[in-house]
Amino acid sequence: MREKMTEQETYCGFIAIVGRPNVGKSTLLNKILGQKISITSRKAQTTRHRIVGIHTEGVYQAVYVDTPGLHIEEKRAINRLMNRAASSAIGDVDLIIFVVDGTHWNDDDEMVLNKLRRAKAPVVLAINKVDNIKNKDELLPFITDVSQKLEFKEIIPISAQRGNNIHNLEKIVRTSLRKGVHHFPEDYVTDRSQRFMASEIIREKLMRFTGEELPYSVTVEIEQFKLNDRGIYEINGLILVEREGQKKMVIGAKGQKLKTIGTEARQDMERLFDNKVHLELWVKVKSGWADDERALRSLGYIDE
């Protein structure tokens, strides 16, 4: 008598990672996935697109949406679009992870919280950067105070940078996944194209190597991404800034800063794509691109 074959039940769900700018959302996503797919920087506003990260472990698949930081300030078109992207990510998910920076609660955190009051999904409060809290006695009163603001599913202190308590956060995520088929193959870590990831890597290096010199009026357009006859990726990246002075900052003395940005970006791409990369970078002034919705659409900031 032949035994009846039974398929193992699988679980899948969508998780939104939200919070004000620069609280460690991208670092958290990268730590969960075990590799970098979302750019990180000490500066705010480094995440401008919703990045989908996919973490599959056995029968569990969690699909993460890493949002731009929510802002009170909406004067510029790009900030309005970033807020729109972050808010829409909250809409149709199974769990929301609300990330805050230690015990530093401010008006932006309050604004995010107010948006979460309307959310249908349960909310986990992840208190990040707890390794930076010098006086640990501050943590318990903060948790007591913040727990009065919303009925959180869980409140969990973490360090995304060091990986502290991330395993327990993942356990909480798994309890929120629904029975159902996996949406992606088990070896997928993102649904973003290599072209998109190349532009994000270049933008991260711009953020890192221009220090506080360059404001957020900079973006990257990939003009060419192809595999040549020798099996090498040929990538041409156009860096757009708003003023001539910013162009000089990016290029640096005798082109050294641009060369450093290019070298670091190429090395990251080769690690991510597991392939040799030939990278060419140019810098161009395009005044007012961050206030022009047509330009933002062509650069991929607005979904068609």
From Swiss-Prot:
Residues 210-287 form the KH type-2 domain. The keyword Lyase does not apply. Residues 19-26 are annotated as: G1. Residues 45-49 are annotated as: G2. Residues 66-69 are annotated as: G3. GO terms for biological process: ribosomal small subunit assembly. One of its GO terms (cellular component) is cytosol. Residues 128-131 are annotated as: G4. PROSITE patterns: G_ERA, KH_TYPE_2. Residues 158-160 are annotated as: G5. One of its GO terms (molecular function) is ribosomal small subunit binding. InterPro entries: G_ERA_dom (IPR030388), GTP-bd (IPR006073), GTPase_Era-like (IPR005662), KH_dom-like_a/b (IPR015946), KH_dom_type_2 (IPR004044), KH_sf_prok-type (IPR009019), P-loop_NTPase (IPR027417), Small_GTP-bd (IPR005225). It is found in: Cytoplasm; Cell inner membrane. Residues 11-186 form the Era-type G domain. SUPFAM superfamilies: P-loop containing nucleoside triphosphate hydrolases (SSF52540), Prokaryotic type KH domain (KH-domain type II) (SSF54814). It is a peripheral membrane protein. GTP binds at residues 19-26, 66-70, 128-131. Keywords: Cell inner membrane, Cell membrane, Cytoplasm, GTP-binding, Membrane, Nucleotide-binding, Ribosome biogenesis, RNA-binding, rRNA-binding. PANTHER family: GTPASE ERA (PTHR42698), GTPASE ERA, MITOCHONDRIAL (PTHR42698:SF1). HAMAP family: GTPase_Era (MF_00367). An essential GTPase that binds both GDP and GTP, with rapid nucleotide exchange. Plays a role in 16S rRNA processing and 30S ribosomal subunit biogenesis and possibly also in cell cycle regulation and energy metabolism. Monomer. Belongs to the TRAFAC class TrmE-Era-EngA-EngB-Septin-like GTPase superfamily. Era GTPase family. This is GTPase Era. It comes from Histophilus somni (strain 2336) (Haemophilus somnus). The lineage of its organism: Bacteria, Pseudomonadati, Pseudomonadota, Gammaproteobacteria, Pasteurellales. The gene is era.
